[in-house]
């Protein structure tokens, strides 16, 4: 679907857009990522953190611009829209899918499913994503993802702070989430490699 048609259908869920990986690699220009404004959670923060992580993995030095809005015209300027707008990477609808383990999908799960695969993706869901998704959808789990959800909430502006600081706080939350996610992904890959080494020895 051409960009202008995609813009026109932003709130209709009529998306045949490229995958995130295709969008990341199709240009060297500024990558515009859109999420909702106002109070943020681990879900939308993690979406941005994962994409920035993947850019580094791919060796791409694209500048990232974060757009925080609920205005359709503003969102339409973005390359990837997450957790808002009613599209491919939003989960605020009555037909939001539930995974086999009973956890409802959130934006971070939808994004991760396009960035990772196989055992790596499964372990990301088990160790981090599913608890973030559960928390964001009002379900309850308790592990690293739940802790991350709680930590990121602390970055939202308090009643005594100016709401104008919200975008700055969001960027700080993304930076923290990047650090946690990078380390978790590294440990997952180490665990997978260890399993393979053990399997080879056993054989």
What are these regions (language model features)?
Residues 5, 20, 64, 197-199:
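Small/flexible residues
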Residues 3-9:
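Short, positively charged and aromatic/hydrophobic N-terminal segments
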Residues 139-203:
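Glycine-rich, Lys/Arg-enriched anion-binding loops that position phosphate/diphosphate groups
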């Amino acid at each position: 679907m051409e960009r202008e048609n995609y813009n026109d259908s932003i709130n209709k869920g009529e998306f045949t857009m490229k995958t995130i990986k295709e969008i990341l690699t199709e240009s060297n220009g500024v990558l515009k990522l859109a999420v909702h404004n106002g109070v943020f959670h681990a879900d939308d923060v993690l979406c941005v953190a994962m994409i920035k992580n993947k850019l580094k993995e791919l060796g791409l030095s694209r500048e990232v611009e974060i757009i925080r809005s609920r205005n359709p015209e503003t969102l339409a300027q973005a390359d990837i829209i997450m957790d808002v707008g009613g599209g491919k990477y939003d989960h605020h609808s009555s037909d939001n899918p539930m995974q086999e383990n009973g956890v409802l999908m959130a934006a971070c799960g939808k994004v991760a499913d396009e960035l990772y695969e196989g055992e790596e993706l499964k372990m990301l869901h088990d160790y981090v994503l599913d608890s973030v998704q559960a928390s964001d959808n009002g379900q309850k789990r308790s592990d690293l993802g739940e802790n991350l959800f709680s930590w990121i909430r602390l970055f939202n502006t308090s009643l005594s702070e100016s709401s104008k600081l919200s975008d700055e706080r969001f960027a700080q939350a993304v930076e923290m989430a990047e650090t946690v996610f990078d380390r978790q992904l590294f440990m997952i890959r180490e665990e997978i490699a260890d399993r393979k080494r053990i399997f080879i020895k056993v054989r």
